[in-house]
């Protein structure tokens, strides 16, 4: 059951970092990667 907690923590951390970068500089790049 610990693996589940660690996975959740990892995903949460990645999500927070992603959000921070995303909001720090708004997506001005034209369709990149999609």
Curated annotation (Swiss-Prot):
The biological process GO terms on file are: photosynthesis
Q: Which residues cross the membrane?
A: 3-23
The text of the family note is: Belongs to the PsbT family.
User: Record's Gene Ontology CC terms?
Assistant: chloroplast thylakoid membrane; photosystem II reaction center
This protein's assembly is summarised as: PSII is composed of 1 copy each of membrane proteins PsbA, PsbB, PsbC, PsbD, PsbE, PsbF, PsbH, PsbI, PsbJ, PsbK, PsbL, PsbM, PsbT, PsbY, PsbZ, Psb30/Ycf12, at least 3 peripheral proteins of the oxygen-evolving complex and a large number of cofactors. It forms dimeric complexes.
The entry's localization annotation reads: Plastid, Chloroplast thylakoid membrane
For this protein, the record's InterPro entries field holds: PSII_PsbT (IPR001743), PSII_PsbT_sf (IPR037268)
- Transferase: present as a keyword of the record? no
Q: What is its main location?
A: plastid
Please give the organism: Adiantum capillus-veneris (Maidenhair fern)
User: From what superkingdom does this record's organism come?
Assistant: Eukaryota
Per UniProt, the keywords (alphabetical) are: Chloroplast, Membrane, Photosynthesis, Photosystem II, Plastid, Thylakoid, Transmembrane, Transmembrane helix
Query: What does the function comment of this entry state?
Result: Found at the monomer-monomer interface of the photosystem II (PS II) dimer, plays a role in assembly and dimerization of PSII. PSII is a light-driven water plastoquinone oxidoreductase, using light energy to abstract electrons from H(2)O, generating a proton gradient subsequently used for ATP formation.
Q: How does it sit in the membrane?
A: Single-pass membrane protein
Q: Which Pfam families match?
A: PsbT
Q: Quote the protein name from its UniProt record.
A: Photosystem II reaction center protein T
